Regions:
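Beta-strand-centric surfaces of beta-sandwich/beta-rich domains
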Residues: 1-168
Length: 169
């Protein structure tokens, strides 16, 4: 609706149609909507309905209802974000028979009836490309127990992990 609460949540799975594994060199996500170009807005967010969204990809189950096995996490989509380029020696894998899992989305009301969707653009490395480095990451901290006090400057949160092998950061 033109005026209503923001929507937060999972959008679901979108099959990619890929028939072979491909490594991604760059990705861009952009919103396409029916907001007229001549409509004024006091913020860039007023021109869009998707504020941000996290997403991942992985091979679809046989019945196409879920992602099975390892998944690839992609950079968050957010208003004003440019394309993400991955280092030459560290492309990310988009698997054959995969789907994008559109997760934590935040869609907001902009005061007018608006229809919109997201388009995903992938630039692939040539067939046969194998990355020299693999992407890794450790989940640090505990988001449940973070206590941010209102109206208090200079708050800090520390979280540490020991690397188990030589790592390029």
């Amino acid at each position: 609706p033109a005026v209503g609460p923001d929507r937060w949540g999972d959008i679901g799975l979108v099959p990619t149609g890929l028939t072979v594994d491909r490594y991604v060199e760059a990705i861009e996500v952009r919103e396409v909507n029916d907001i007229p170009a001549d409509v004024e807005s006091s913020t860039v967010g007023g021109r869009y309905i998707f504020h941000h969204m996290t997403f991942s990809s992985g091979a679809l189950s046989e019945d196409g209802t879920e992602i099975e096995g390892p998944s690839t996490r992609w950079p968050i989509h957010e208003v004003g974000r440019n394309a993400d380029l991955f280092p030459e020696k560290a492309g990310r894998l988009l698997r054959a028979n995969s789907a994008l899992h559109l997760r934590a989305s935040h869609v907001h009301s902009n005061g007018r009836e608006t229809t919109g969707h997201l388009e995903f653009g992938f630039k692939f490395y040539p067939l046969g490309y194998e990355p020299e480095y693999r992407r890794g990451g450790a989940l640090l901290g505990n988001g449940v127990d973070i206590d941010v006090k209102p109206n208090l400057a200079d708050q800090e949160f520390h979280s540490y992990s020991v690397l188990s092998e030589h790592t390029k950061i």
